[in-house]
Amino acid sequence: MIRYCLTSYREDLVILDIINDSFSIVPDAGSLLKERDKLLKEFPQLSYFFDSEYHIGSVSRNSDTSFLEERWFLPEPDKTLYKCSLFKRFILLLKVFYYSWNIEKKGMAWIFISNKKENRLYSLNEEHLIRKEISNLSIIFHLNIFKSDCLTYSYALKRILNSRNIDAHLVIGVRTQPFYSHSWVEVGGQVINDAPNMRDKLSVIAEI
């Protein structure tokens, strides 16, 4: 399993330690991320991270884009869609409890370990199904008694869509000065539960 995920934001290097569920920032090292020899020559203390299995993510397309740090808001349910039955809501809530409890207790490592690797295809006729599953999840998510944040919501949405044979990916983005991390879901390279230009605002440190 990958131990570290790395990316850069402006001049900063950001490291995600999956096992310890923590982020680290190394100022002025970001520009050397893709030049390993130069990076380790100038920052020899980073050799520890490169001796383990690691992944290098993508850099924000426009780090000058303003990004308002604010509390994450749960997506509003789509009132134009048919609401799922109470039984389905109950089953969905149990899944959310399971995902959020494990994320709260076991951290990022559990997400990587439990990630399913099946290859699935996406077609445009699945857009209605995606909208419906987002709406259904939003209806019950406020009842979650465990960790409720963008990571939990996005991971739950990814797993729900995967179970419907949709190749959804959890994406984790970061920025620095001040530090901020955020999670969203993409299908076919498109953001489905957040602003479409998230990759312009944040550097992607992990895709699951």
UniProtKB/Swiss-Prot annotation:
Keyword Cytoplasm: yes
Keyword ATP-binding: no
Pfam families: Transglut_core3 (PF13471)
GO CC field: cytoplasm
Main function: Along with McjC, necessary and sufficient to process the inactive microcin J25 (McjA) precursor into the active peptide.
NCBIfam families: lasso_biosyn_B2
Name used for this protein in its record: Microcin J25-processing protein McjB
Native source organism of the sequence: Escherichia coli
Encoding gene per record: mcjB
